[in-house]
Amino acid sequence: MARIIMCGSFKGGVGKTASSWNLAYSLAEMGKRVLAVDFDSQANLTTCFGIEDPAAVPVTIGHLMMNRLEDEEVPDPSEFIQSRNGVDFIPSSMMLSAVDSKLRMEMGSEKMLAGILEPLRELYDYIIVDTCPSLGTLTINALTVADEVIIAVNPQLLAMMGLQDFIRTVKKVRSRLNDRLQIAGILLTMCDARTNLCKVITEQLTETFDGQIRIFKSIIPNTVKVGESIYYSEPLLEYAPENKACKAYRNLAEEVTGDES
């Protein structure tokens, strides 16, 4: 049965999607069966998987959510799950924006995504859900189905300010909608260990959350190879396997699975 892990943040531009993508491939490299779900209308994860025009995809997560909203049957997984280089994925498109608007007016809308992903648990070891950088209805849906959430943070004060809001939301969802939900950990991304700011933020995180919330040992460094790999739609394992960011994502996968050496 799959562990459903949401990768989220309160602020955009923190390397969340790149982390979802590369974590999925790092888990697959370990022999895990992985499904990545793009649950963001910007469809950045979909683009990472090499789909140049998400709007042309016949069945996306937006279509599936609309099926659920209109009490229609969700199609067979073979109709909406795509695969690339050993990782399965469900693409997204701007259609998810229309779904977001409808969710706000729908009773019990928090569990719409759960109705799609729960039947897929038995097919995978890990389901990674990449979400939009906000605390709206889509994010609540993802938190309601997730077993764990990885919170991506980059070493900037504004990103830190949003972190507390995000954690409060996770706790509310846990108490009201999903008592399984746990914070897997805080992931520092786009970090230049040589800068004073990165050191200060890392120390601040440790002081604030030590003993309460795990801070992953794997710190994702700021490197141009991450951006280049996204541009070429090649995960770091393929594009730059010896790069320090690739090694960090491999280490993260080991932390997530508990297979640390």
Segments predicted by a language model, with ranges:
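P-loop NTP-binding core
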Residues: 1-261
